[in-house]
A protein has these predicted regions:
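Loop/turn elements at helix/coil->beta-strand transitions in domains of secreted/extracellular proteins
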Residues: 50-53, 84-89, 117-119, 140, ...
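N-terminal "domain-start" segment that seeds a small globular fold
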Residues: 21-43, 64-69
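Thiol-/selenol-based redox modules, centered on thioredoxin-like
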Residues: 138-177
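Short, internal strand/loop/helix patches
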Residues: 89-93, 103-138
C-alpha cells in the first residue's frame, strides 16, 4: 500500500513537469520545429537567423481575427519605418488540425495572406505546435521571439486594440538589441 501511495505521489509531481517540458513560456527559449510551406520546403525558426520573429499560429476559420494588429505592424514597417525590416520577420503558420475547410481553400486563403503581407506561410498538418508549444486549437495565437529565440510575448485570441502599441514598441526594442 505504501509503495502504491508513493508511486501515485511521485507521478503527481513528475507528470505536470514532464507535460510542461517544451511548452512556451515568456523568458524561456522556444522549442524548435520544422514545418513546410506550400511547395513542401521545410522551414525552422533558424531559417531567419538574427531576426526577431512574429509567429502567427492561425486556425483558418479565424484567419482575419488579428488583421488590425498585423496591419499596424505592417504600417510600423512600411510607413512609420520604426521596425527595421532587416531585423524582423513576421510569418504565419496555418493550424490545419483546427479546421474542416478543404485543403485547397485553406491554401488559397494562405496564398492571399502571403501576398497581402508579403510573407511566408507554413502549414502544420500534424499539430506539431499544439504538442511542442502547447498552443490551443481553434484559435489564433501570436508569439514574439527575439534573435536568440527567447519567447518575449505570447498572445492568445484577438489582440486588444489597446495592447497593439505596446507590442509594436516591444518589437521595435527587440530589433535594436
Amino acid at each position: 500500500m505504501k509503495k502504491l501511495l508513493f508511486t501515485l505521489l511521485l507521478a503527481a509531481f513528475i507528470l505536470p513537469f514532464a507535460a510542461a517540458q517544451g511548452k512556451l513560456e515568456v523568458g524561456k527559449k522556444a522549442p524548435e520545429w520544422a514545418l513546410p510551406d506550400a511547395s513542401k520546403q521545410e522551414f525552422t525558426m533558424n531559417s531567419w537567423p538574427g531576426k526577431v520573429l512574429q509567429i502567427n499560429y492561425v486556425d483558418p476559420d479565424n484567419e482575419d481575427l488579428n488583421d488590425t494588429f498585423n496591419d499596424a505592424v505592417e504600417k510600423a514597417i512600411d510607413i512609420d519605418k520604426i521596425i527595421d525590416q532587416n531585423a524582423y520577420k513576421g510569418f504565419g503558420i496555418v493550424d490545419l488540425q483546427s479546421t474542416r475547410l478543404p485543403d485547397g481553400l485553406v491554401r488559397a486563403i494562405a496564398g492571399r495572406k502571403a501576398k497581402r503581407y508579403n510573407t511566408t506561410i507554413l502549414f502544420d498538418s500534424k499539430g506539431v505546435l499544439h504538442e511542442s508549444w502547447g498552443l490551443p486549437k481553434d484559435s489564433y495565437s501570436v508569439v514574439i521571439v527575439d534573435k536568440n529565440r527567447i519567447v518575449r510575448g505570447i498572445y492568445y485570441g484577438k489582440i486588444a486594440d489597446a495592447d497593439i502599441p505596446g507590442i509594436i514598441e516591444m518589437i521595435v526594442k527587440l530589433t535594436k538589441e
